[in-house]
A protein has these predicted regions:
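Nucleotide-activated chemistry modules centered on ATP-dependent adenylation/adenylyltransferase
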Residues: 1-171
Length: 171
């Protein structure tokens, strides 16, 4: 439920209402993100399935001393705990045929070279319908369709805007 996520969620609801929407609630979302998620779920009537890490954020913070520095082994463990493991659990339970993702070329160097349709490392078909959209395109879509946006978003697995979150390069 980060910036511009409403675009993909709206497209999904138009094309295939009642699609199961996976949200990995890592426990580090801002208050605004939770309010945005509630508002968008109500507005779009989303069939939301929430997956969380096994360990709470508070307990993990106590063990790891807070969110670990990026590019360290501890941060890799952190990412696996808060994002990869809940995502794997979601895939195992839901067993989707397709993973629709809101990644866009303008977001990171890795995403700039991504194909709209690909298979991930585990063979799951991954489709990025908004891959070629710019920020201006996304804003125009939000405005045209009277959709909210969430800019007070923080992803502790990325930390910096130009890093990957772990899902698109998971084991």
């Amino acid at each position: 439920f980060g910036p511009f996520e409403a675009v993909l969620l709206h497209l999904i609801q138009i094309l295939k209402p009642h699609t199961e929407i996976i949200w990995i609630d890592n426990g580090y979302n801002t208050h605004a993100t939770y309010k945005f998620a509630d508002k968008l779920c109500e507005q779009l009537k989303l069939n939301l399935k929430v997956y969380t890490p096994t360990m709470t954020a508070r307990r993990r913070d106590a063990r790891m001393g807070g969110i670990p520095e990026v590019d360290t082994e501890l941060h890799l463990q952190f990412t696996k705990q808060v994002k990869i493991e809940p995502f794997k659990k979601a895939l195992k339970e839901i067993q989707p045929e397709v993973w629709l993702t809101a990644i866009r070329r303008v977001q990171t160097v890795q995403r700039a070279g991504t194909d709209i349709v690909s298979a991930d490392k585990n063979g799951l078909l991954k489709v990025a319908p908004v891959l070629n959209m710019t920020d201006a395109d996304m804003i125009a879509y939000l405005e045209t369709n009277n959709l909210p946006n969430e800019l007070d978003y923080y992803d502790p697995t990325k930390v910096y805007a130009n890093r990957e979150c772990g899902l698109h390069n998971r084991d």
